[in-house]
């Protein structure tokens, strides 16, 4: 009897590490100390901060993983994992510094999980943070064949005086919406149920879709770090940032407004076809759509109304599609006009 016969293949682990080494190294920032393989990752705080505050976030990808398994496509899931974490850290105004991942599977497939980590590295590059370390657990009998779980953890930094917590948001402030890339990483339990009850598979291509249902739904979550951080460094007064994740617009927008509320104009932004298809095919009510999906908006910013046009133009030059979607109001919660 040995470890391999018990279901843990150490040699496969070595192969996996060899496959990911180059992708991980490409994410390296100057503040990183040491390299791959240490017991802990070392990272020096960047210079220039008077009162640095660390901001931490952790998240996973949820049942979007089931779609990756069904299509045997694993190169985008890692980007999703990074995006879910770094966008949350960004919502406090922070610059993401480093990221760590946790991967668990029943039987380690070096090629499959290397694809996941390569996606994580791509997401880290897009967010400007280091992939500082990670854990890969091979757990025989714990997961179905070919399946795995992934979670991430991100740490960022922000000057104490520049923390964005919604407390400076004022009634009348403009709300700007940054377009999402699609469903992102929330609501997939409902998505999967809709597709199942409709008797469809992931290769089905609805009439108004640019690709198959599976390809559209696997589009990775958009990472907003660089354009929004650039706007902050350019001096724009962004007073609140809402990352539109689980809970949709209904639950997430108020989290960024310091106890105030939002009036959103429904016709002010285009809702991507994937959402109208899900609503129609699944017979999903408007309230459920509003509190489950991002409906085409991945990030919502609150800023003084006199800066709204300039901020919108600035972010557009950074490659974002930005729309003025409403205003901050006195009454808490979200209402639609």
Swiss-Prot record:
Name the reaction it catalyses: 2-formamido-N(1)-(5-O-phospho-beta-D-ribosyl)acetamidine + ATP = 5-amino-1-(5-phospho-beta-D-ribosyl)imidazole + ADP + phosphate + H(+)
Please tell me whether the keyword Transcription is annotated for this protein: no
Give compartment(s). Answer: Cytoplasm
A Pfam family annotated for this UniProt entry: AIRS
Answer yes or no on keyword Nucleotide-binding.
yes
Q: Which HAMAP family match?
A: AIRS
- Superkingdom of the organism of origin: Bacteria
Q: Its pathway? A: Purine metabolism; IMP biosynthesis via de novo pathway; 5-amino-1-(5-phospho-D-ribosyl)imidazole from N(2)-formyl-N(1)-(5-phospho-D-ribosyl)glycinamide: step 2/2
Q: Which family does it belong to?
A: Belongs to the AIR synthase family.
Annotated GO CC locations: cytosol
Per its record, what are the GO molecular function terms?
A: ATP binding; phosphoribosylamine-glycine ligase activity; phosphoribosylformylglycinamidine cyclo-ligase activity
Keyword set, alphabetical order = ATP-binding, Cytoplasm, Ligase, Nucleotide-binding, Purine biosynthesis
GO aspect biological process, one term: purine nucleotide biosynthetic process
> Which positions carry the signal peptide feature in this UniProt record?
none
Which NCBIfam families does this entry report, sorted A to Z? purM
Official protein name in the record = Phosphoribosylformylglycinamidine cyclo-ligase
Q: What is the lineage of its organism?
A: Bacteria, Bacillati, Cyanobacteriota, Cyanophyceae, Gloeobacterales
Protein EC: 6.3.3.1
InterPro entries in alphabetical order: PurM-like_C_dom (IPR010918), PurM-like_C_sf (IPR036676), PurM-like_N (IPR016188), PurM-like_N_sf (IPR036921), PurM_cligase (IPR004733)
């Amino acid at each position: 009897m040995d470890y391999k016969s018990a279901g843990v293949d150490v040699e496969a682990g070595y192969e996996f590490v060899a496959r990911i080494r180059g992708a991980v190294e490409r994410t390296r920032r100057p503040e990183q100390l040491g390299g791959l393989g240490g017991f802990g990752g070392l990272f020096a705080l960047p210079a220039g901060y008077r009162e640095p505050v660390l901001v931490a976030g952790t998240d996973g990808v949820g049942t979007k993983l089931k779609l990756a398994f069904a299509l045997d496509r694993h190169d985008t899931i890692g980007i999703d994992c990074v995006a879910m974490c770094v966008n949350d850290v960004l919502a406090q105004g922070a610059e993401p510094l480093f990221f760590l991942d946790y991967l668990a599977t029943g039987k380690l497939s070096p090629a499959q999980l290397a694809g996941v980590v390569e996606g994580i590295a791509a997401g880290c590059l897009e967010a400007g943070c280091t992939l500082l370390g990670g854990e890969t657990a091979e757990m025989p009998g714990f997961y179905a064949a070919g399946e795995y779980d992934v979670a991430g953890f991100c740490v960022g930094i922000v000057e104490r005086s520049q923390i964005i917590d919604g407390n400076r948001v004022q009634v009348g402030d403009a709300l700007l919406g940054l377009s999402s890339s699609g469903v992102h990483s929330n609501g997939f339990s409902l998505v999967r149920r809709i597709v199942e009850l409709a008797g469809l598979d992931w290769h089905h291509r609805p009439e108004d879709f640019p690709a198959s249902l599976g390809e559209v739904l696997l589009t990775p979550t958009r990472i907003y770090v660089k354009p929004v951080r650039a706007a902050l460094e350019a001096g724009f007064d962004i007073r609140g940032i809402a990352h539109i994740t689980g809970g949709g617009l209904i639950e997430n927008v108020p989290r960024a407004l310091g106890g105030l509320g939002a009036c959103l104009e429904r016709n002010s932004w285009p809702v991507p076809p994937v959402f109208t298809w899900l609503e129609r095919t699944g017979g999903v009510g408007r309230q459920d759509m509003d509190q489950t999906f991002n409906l085409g908006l991945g990030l919502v910013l609150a800023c003084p109304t006199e800066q709204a046009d300039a901020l919108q133009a600035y972010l557009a030059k950074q490659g974002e599609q930005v729309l003025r979607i409403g205003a901050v109001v006195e009454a808490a919660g979200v209402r639609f006009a």
